[in-house]
């Protein structure tokens, strides 16, 4: 079924300039709606780990982008105090008490998740924003004013602290989503964008900014890398001096690596304070 769905969406994408809310076949509409519904249920996801490597399903990103072309903006009520005007309704717009109970997650006012995002059991959404295509796995806390961008992949038992920004990606199609693997802690006001991967059991301190151009300096090895935080890393904000010594530029510093057992036993503050 998903192969047939993918073929319809890939073909529609090639002719997307001709599509509009008034000009699209029933087959295309149904395929796009089904893809969004599957993303919403978590039956499909934009990226998944296969044989130890992350694979991105670009056709699902195409489905999300096509959905914008196929829908008109419409007023959306906001609990009587305001209205929104958009193409994508709230994930919870038509939820009943039974739906919330079956979902097994908490949604604290005024948290927003758009339809097409997946929220797993035992997730807590504090007043935060989760965009279309995102996947938030079991036991994760999305704290106050945190943002989970479009198509971002958040693992199990992750803590996204207050004000954290997890970047979204829909265009360009070749760009990969941000991935935060299981059991990671992302400190307050940190930003992870541009398809950076934070591997499992890592701790990112408060105020760390990670993009594809951010130098990641491993204090133990002296190595500089980009775009990926290795599993079990403890990362803080830092600076690296210029070659001529006239200035320094921002970087992220891996101050140590810990295994899952140590991570479970030792408090976060102790990990971050240790030499």
UniProtKB/Swiss-Prot annotation:
Subcellular location(s) per record: Cytoplasm
Record field: transmembrane: none
InterPro entries cross-referenced by the UniProt entry: DapD_Trfase_Hexpep_rpt_fam, Hexapep, Hexapep_transf_CS, THP_succinylTrfase_dom1, THP_succinylTrfase_N_sf, Trimer_LpxA-like_sf
Keywords on record: Acyltransferase, Amino-acid biosynthesis, Cytoplasm, Diaminopimelate biosynthesis, Lysine biosynthesis, Repeat, Transferase
This protein's record includes keyword Plastid: no
Family according to the record: Belongs to the transferase hexapeptide repeat family.
GO molecular function: 2,3,4,5-tetrahydropyridine-2,6-dicarboxylate N-succinyltransferase activity; nucleotidyltransferase activity
Lineage summary: Bacteria, Pseudomonadati, Pseudomonadota, Betaproteobacteria, Burkholderiales
Name of the protein this chain belongs to: 2,3,4,5-tetrahydropyridine-2,6-dicarboxylate N-succinyltransferase
Cross-referenced Pfam families: Hexapep_2, THDPS_N_2
Catalytically driven reaction(s): (S)-2,3,4,5-tetrahydrodipicolinate + succinyl-CoA + H2O = (S)-2-succinylamino-6-oxoheptanedioate + CoA
Subunit structure: Homotrimer.
